[in-house]
């Protein structure tokens, strides 16, 4: 038929498509027609072949085939045991054919590989070409469920064959229809590599290895007439860092003596020992399995008693050349007492330079301050040079430089409970009575160079007075603390009260001031610097309240910022620094650089002139609180 392929024996059906069965002849049995009309669908919707459904029908059973299972299966699960053709002895299905064109298998595609022919001459023998693959064991296999897919054949790579021998059987010249005779080759070892070196998809397998027998070497007999030189054992090797120090009360092994060849004894035989040489120490057994290492660091065992006296825990100490038992100590930098040993590392001065073998009981107890105390008493700080002094307002003290003890004061001076020193002046050093003129301020020029107080007599404005003042019994007058001017918390308010007080006299004769300053005792140290700046006008004679005279001489203002940068000890009240000297001027209050002042008050023994007993001729210390 042109459009169909009659189903017969030996013709495989390789394509499944929708098919329908028809009975063109009336010779088909009517019972089979009833089966086809009622139970067998002619066109399957899922594309299942009709013969497959016919074979799986439970009511149709062919003689040689087993009955199919009754469970339903899809088109991809049919068993390969059922062929796609009907048996030939059933004549009723002989003329059943397909109505659609079926894709046939090309007979030229399945071409069997022919017999491999060898070259005619043995001189042209070579290895197998790479395009010839090893034939599979079953070349005609089809896939069980997909017949158009061939099974995968593992590729083992090229076969490396050795050179074939010259004695080979030739094939006949003409090809015959019979089976081809392969050449008979001698058995040779062919190394076949199952897995290629660059394949990552192949399972790894052990490569074939050839086992080579070990070469037996003859045993050499030891020479009886020559003793071999044995190398020194490793235990005697000091190593890079030298021999390890020994524990106390231990002795070092004697050094190995060089082997000296003795008299040749041809008859005596030296036995060869398999075990290593025994250790000279007691209580240590050699281990033949362990590699021989240095044993110099191993202390002696507990079985060996030390020769020295029994001691407690062995602690390392320093090594000294003068020590009589130098080999019994281990060189180390750790002292016997670990707590006292931390002193030099922390910078304690008392722990430096002491021997290491000093016992704890012999060591002096450490002080609290960890600083050495000198036997000399504390000295006053030396005055710094003038170039190093700078105006600093950080440390100001109102405590005076009082002599210690206070009994060292001169007879004309006395101290009060508030820290003031009062000096009694002679009777002639009193100012004249007069009314204070109104204040008059003038622009102050640049100050003169500062000079210390000890050079007071050398200044141009002050001639050098005699150093031995006259003292009268009447000048030695003591006053109670109640006569002292009260202290005010506000220095400005205190100055204002001093200005408006009518009983305070601020006029002073320069000659009387010079004599008063000359009668004062010299201070214990340089305490001041003199500023001679004409800020106000001081008349020569006390004028009337309505007259104004030109200035004749400037007032003497003593300002001495001494000891500003000196170190002040807070524990000693007798050592302090005061800032300046100040004298009241007739022009009113002068604002100084620091509220800490001491003033000069004059006291006259007679009060008949109507002047207040206290005049500005006494030192006033501590008139302001601390500014620290």
From Swiss-Prot:
Residues 497-507 have a biased composition (Basic and acidic residues). Pfam families: Tymo_45kd_70kd. Residues 434-450 have a biased composition (Pro residues). The keyword Transmembrane helix does not apply. Residues 299-312 have a biased composition (Low complexity). Residues 320-331 have a biased composition (Polar residues). Keywords: Host-virus interaction, Inhibition of host innate immune response by virus, Suppressor of RNA silencing, Viral immunoevasion. Residues 1-25, 141-332, 347-398, 418-507, 535-628 are annotated as: Disordered. It comes from the Viruses. One of its GO terms (biological process) is symbiont-mediated suppression of host innate immune response. Belongs to the tymoviridae protein p69 family. Acts as a suppressor of RNA-mediated gene silencing, also known as post-transcriptional gene silencing (PTGS), a mechanism of plant viral defense that limits the accumulation of viral RNAs. This is 69 kDa protein.
């Amino acid at each position: 038929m042109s459009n169909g392929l009659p189903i017969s024996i030996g013709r495989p059906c390789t394509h499944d498509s929708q098919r329908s069965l028809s009975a063109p002849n009336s010779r088909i049995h009517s019972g089979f027609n009833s089966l086809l009309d009622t139970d067998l669908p002619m066109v399957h919707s899922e594309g299942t072949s009709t013969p497959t459904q016919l074979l799986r029908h439970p009511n149709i059973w062919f003689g040689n085939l087993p009955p199919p299972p009754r469970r339903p299966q899809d088109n991809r699960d049919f068993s390969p045991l059922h062929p796609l053709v009907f048996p030939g002895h059933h004549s009723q299905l002989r003329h059943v054919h397909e109505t659609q064109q079926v894709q046939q298998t090309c007979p030229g595609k399945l071409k069997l590989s022919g017999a491999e022919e060898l070259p005619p001459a043995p001189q042209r023998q070579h290895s197998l070409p790479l395009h010839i693959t090893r034939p599979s064991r079953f070349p005609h296999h089809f896939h069980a469920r997909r017949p158009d897919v061939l099974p995968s054949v593992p590729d083992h790579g090229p076969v490396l064959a050795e050179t074939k021998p010259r004695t080979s059987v030739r094939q006949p010249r003409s090809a015959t229809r019979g089976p081809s005779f392969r050449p008979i080759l001698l058995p040779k070892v062919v190394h076949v590599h199952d897995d290629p070196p660059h394949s990552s998809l192949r399972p790894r397998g052990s490569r074939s290895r050839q086992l080579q027998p070990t070469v037996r070497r003859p045993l050499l007999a030891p020479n009886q007439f020559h003793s071999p030189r044995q190398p020194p054992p490793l235990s005697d090797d000091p190593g890079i860092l030298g021999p390890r120090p020994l524990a106390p009360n231990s002795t070092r092994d004697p050094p190995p003596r060089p082997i000296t060849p003795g008299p040749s004894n041809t008859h005596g035989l030296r036995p060869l020992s398999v075990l290593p040489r025994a250790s000279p120490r007691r209580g240590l057994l050699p281990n033949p399995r362990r590699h021989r290492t240095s044993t110099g660091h191993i202390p002696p065992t507990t079985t060996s008693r030390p020769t020295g006296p029994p001691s407690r825990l062995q602690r390392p100490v320093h090594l000294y050349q003068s020590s009589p038992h130098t080999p019994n100590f281990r060189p180390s930098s750790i002292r016997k007492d670990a707590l006292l040993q931390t002193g030099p590392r922390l910078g304690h001065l008392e722990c430096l330079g002491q021997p290491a073998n000093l016992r704890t009981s012999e060591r002096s107890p450490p002080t609290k301050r960890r600083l050495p105390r000198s036997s000399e008493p504390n000295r006053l700080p030396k005055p710094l040079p003038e170039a190093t002094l700078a105006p600093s307002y950080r440390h100001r003290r109102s405590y005076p430089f009082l002599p210690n003890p206070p009994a060292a004061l001169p007879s004309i001076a006395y101290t009060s409970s508030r820290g003031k020193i009062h000096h009694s002046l002679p009777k002639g050093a009193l100012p004249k009575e007069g009314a204070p003129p109104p204040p008059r301020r003038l622009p102050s020029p640049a100050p003169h160079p500062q000079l210390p107080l000890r050079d007071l007599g050398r200044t141009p404005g002050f001639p050098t007075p005699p150093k031995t003042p006259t003292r009268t019994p009447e000048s030695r007058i003591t006053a109670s603390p109640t006569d002292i001017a009260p202290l005010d918390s506000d220095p400005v308010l205190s100055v204002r009260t001093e200005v408006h007080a009518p009983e305070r006299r601020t006029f002073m004769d320069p000659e009387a001031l010079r004599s008063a300053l000359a009668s004062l005792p010299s201070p214990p140290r340089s305490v001041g610097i003199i500023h001679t700046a004409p800020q106000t006008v001081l008349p020569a004679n006390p004028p009337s309240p309505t007259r104004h005279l030109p200035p004749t001489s400037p007032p003497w203002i003593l300002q001495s910022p001494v000891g500003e940068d000196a170190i002040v000890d807070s524990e000693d009240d007798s050592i302090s620094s005061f800032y300046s000297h100040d004298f009241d001027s007739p022009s009113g209050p002068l604002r100084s650089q620091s509220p800490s002042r001491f003033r000069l008050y004059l006291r006259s023994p007679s009060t008949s002139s109507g002047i207040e007993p206290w005049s500005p001729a006494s030192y006033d210390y501590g008139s302001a609180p601390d500014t620290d």
